[in-house]
From Swiss-Prot:
Keywords: ATP-binding, Cell shape, Cell wall biogenesis/degradation, Cytoplasm, Ligase, Magnesium, Manganese, Metal-binding, Nucleotide-binding, Peptidoglycan synthesis
Name of the protein described by the UniProt record: D-alanine--D-alanine ligase
InterPro entries: ATP-grasp, ATP_grasp_subdomain_1, D-Ala_lig_Van_CS, D_ala_D_ala, Dala_Dala_lig_C, PreATP-grasp_dom_sf
Cellular component GO terms, alphabetical: cytoplasm
GO BP: cell wall organization; peptidoglycan biosynthetic process; regulation of cell shape
SUPFAM superfamilies assigned: Glutathione synthetase ATP-binding domain-like, PreATP-grasp domain
Binding residue positions for ATP: 126-180
The gene coding this protein: ddl
Protein origin, superkingdom: Bacteria
Sites where the protein binds Mg(2+) 2: 262, 264
Catalysed conversion reaction: 2 D-alanine + ATP = D-alanyl-D-alanine + ADP + phosphate + H(+)
Organism: Maridesulfovibrio salexigens (strain ATCC 14822 / DSM 2638 / NCIMB 8403 / VKM B-1763)
Role according to the record: Cell wall formation.
Length: 302
C-alpha cells in the first residue's frame, strides 16, 4: 500500500511527533508499504492532494492539528482511511475539562478540578487550593504542566499555562502511584506502572522522553482485582468518548482507589512508548502493532 505518514505539525510536541515517526516509517517499510512523509507545518496546502492518492494515512501528530481532529476531518474529505478516533471524538478528548466533565457525568472518579480562563486568572478559582497541578487545558506530553505547593507557585503556574493557551486546568493533588492502560480493538491491554525519577514531582516531559527518565514496569505489579477494575474503566471511558481502534488512559491510584486523569487518542508510538510496551506484553511486536492499527483503520471505512 501507499501510506501517507503524517507527523510534525505546529504544536509544542512537534519534536516528539517527528521522533516517533522515524520508527513508524521503518516499520511501514519493513511491512512492505510505500511511505510518503508529510509535515503539516511545512506542506499543509498539499495534504488533501497527497491523501487523495494514498491508500492509508498513518497519523503521528500530538496536539494540533492531529489530536484536535483537524487532520482527521480533512482526510474524511477525500475518504482516506486512517487509524484512531474520528474528528468529533478527537476534539472532545483533547480538551481536558470537557473530558473530565464526561467522567464526572458518568460516575468515573477523577481528581477534583477547575477550569480557569485567561481573562480571570487566579481569581477564577473557586474551591481548589494548593497543592495542585496546573495543566494546559489542551495538549499532552506534560508540556507546561506545573505543581504548585503555595499560592505564589499557583499564580506562576497559571501564568506559564496562559503563555501556551487561553485556559488552564487546575487539578487537586492526589498522592498515589501512576499507572496507564492502553486499549486496542476494544480490548484493554496490560497495565504499566510508572515510577518518576526521585527528583520529579510527576511524570513530566523529561521523565517521559529522557534516557534517565521514569521507570516503567509492564505488567504493573498491582492487585489483579484492581487491575481488572482499571481495565474496565479504561474500556468504559474509551466508549463514552466515542473513540475507536486504540487509546491510552492515565490513572493515579490513591489508597487503593483508581482516579482517571485523562485519555490520549494518539498515544506515543516509538518502540519504547507506553502503548507499544503494553502491546508487546500482549503479544504484538512493534511492526505487528502498526499492521494492526492499519487493519483497524481500514475496517472503519468498509
Amino acid at each position: 500500500m501507499h501510506v501517507l505518514l503524517i507527523a510534525g505539525g505546529w504544536s509544542e510536541e512537534r519534536e516528539v511527533s517527528l521522533s516517533g515517526a522515524k520508527g513508524i516509517e521503518q516499520a511501514l517499510l519493513e511491512l512492505g508499504h510505500d511511505v510518503e512523509f508529510v509535515d503539516p507545518a511545512k506542506d499543509f496546502k498539499n495534504i488533501l492532494l497527497l491523501a487523495e492518492h494514498a491508500d492509508f494515512a498513518f497519523i503521528n501528530l500530538h496536539g494540533s492539528p492531529g489530536e484536535d481532529g483537524l487532520i482527521q476531518a480533512m482526510l474524511n474529505q477525500v475518504n482516506c482511511p486512517y487509524q484512531g478516533a474520528e474528528p468529533e471524538s478527537s476534539f472532545l478528548t483533547l480538551n481536558k475539562a470537557a473530558t473530565k466533565t464526561v467522567f464526572d457525568h458518568h460516575g468515573i472518579l477523577t481528581p477534583k478540578w477547575e477550569l480557569v480562563c485567561a481573562a480571570d486568572g487566579c481569581k477564577g478559582l473557586q474551591d481548589l487550593e494548593p497543592p495542585v497541578f496546573i495543566k494546559p487545558n489542551s495538549g499532552g506530553s506534560s508540556l507546561g504542566m506545573t505543581f504548585a505547593r503555595t499560592a505564589e507557585e499557583l499564580e506562576k503556574g497559571i501564568e506559564t499555562v496562559f503563555s501556551l493557551g487561553d485556559s488552564a486546568l487546575v487539578e487537586e493533588y492526589t498522592k498515589g502511584i501512576e499507572v496507564t492502560c492502553g486499549i486496542l480493538d476494544g480490548e484493554p491491554m496490560p497495565l504499566i506502572l510508572i515510577n518518576p525519577p526521585d527528583n520529579a514531582e510527576f511524570f513530566d516531559y523529561h521523565s517521559k522522553y529522557a534516557l534517565d527518565g521514569a521507570e516503567e514496569i509492564c505488567p504493573a505489579p498491582i492487585d489483579p482485582v484492581l487491575t481488572e477494575q482499571i481495565q474496565q474503566i479504561t474500556a468504559k471511558a474509551h466508549k463514552l468518548l466515542g473513540l475507536t481502534d486504540y487509546s491510552r488512559a492515565d490513572f493515579i491510584i490513591s489508597e487503593g482507589v483508581p482516579y482517571l486523569l485523562e485519555v490520549n487518542t494518539l498515544p506515543g508510538m516509538t518502540p519504547t512508548s507506553l502503548v507499544p510496551q503494553a502491546a508487546k506484553e500482549a503479544g504484538y511486536s512493534f511492526n505487528e502493532l502498526i499492521a494492526k492499527l492499519i487493519e483497524l483503520g481500514q475496517r472503519k471505512r468498509k
